[in-house]
Amino acid sequence: MREPHRLLVIANETVEGTPLHDAIRARADEGPIEVLVVAPALNSRLRHWMSDEDAARRAAEERLVACLQRLERTGVRPYGWVGDADPLLAMEDALHVFSADEVIVATHPEERSNWLAHHLVDRARERFALPIAHVVVDAYVAA
């Protein structure tokens, strides 16, 4: 039996999106898979400045739980956690404990993506020696 493909997924508001779930499911269809989903706890600048991280963590946790449950219904056995607000740091933290074979970063479309405006996918590809796939999820048609 072959070793499972270890997939790290970094997504927040896009974590429930159908394109992301389709990408994960496609990899699961190829053979055994282990999936770790990390949802960075994104916060507004004002809330961050006021040190109010609780609302961001709760929102990320709710989205993450819904994502994990949806994946389980399709036969994928994922696990996940809420990560650092900085998605690159959240990715790095996850890679310290999860030896991924591949990373999927899910973002909003370019015109609405803060992560793409900050070149997150390009920076991740420069920083980590792993294949990094980019999946675009339009939140208005996410599920």
Where are these regions (language model features)?
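Residue-level signature of catalytic and energy-coupling elements of molecular machines
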Residues: 24, 91, 124
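Acidic/glycine-enriched edge-of-secondary-structure segments
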Residues: 4-11, 66-84
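N-terminal targeting/anchoring "stem" of glycan-biosynthesis enzymes
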Residues: 88-90, 126, 137
